[in-house]
Amino acid sequence: MPRNEDAMMHLNWAREAEKQRDFLAARMGYLKCVESWKQAGDNAELEKATKEYEAFVRRDPIFEKLISALLPIIQANPGILQSDIAKQAESMDWAALYSYNRPVAREDIYYALYFAGKFGRITRTKKGRSYELRTPG
């Protein structure tokens, strides 16, 4: 399947998953859509898909739950490394986060931290193979 068709398929799946309130599937669909446009080399479509993905993240209740649990850790430990906070967060009780039995994965934590940085809720500064995390101000 050509990358542009692949991207559109993932975009449609993402939109449908969000309508069904399956936010994890929607996130994966948007991510795969963006990656497909990136691989296809279509910058105009990539930009549109990226904007739609970012808009989804702002609506994603899982993102909000994740970041609301991660922000206090960052505030209490300015400069904590992303790899260290991911280890701490993986051991936290996230039972209410998903409506199905799935533990929070490192990718979930990185998703929340990446977009929190992109949206200005935290700062992420490259430090070795990880990122140093701080709250703004």
Model-based region annotation:
Residues 16-17, 36, 43, 56:
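Residue position in alpha-helical solenoids
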Residues 47-79:
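Short alpha-helical segments that sit at the start of domains
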Residues 79-100:
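Short acidic, hydrophobic short linear motifs in intrinsically disordered regions
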Residues 117-126:
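A short, conserved structural fragment
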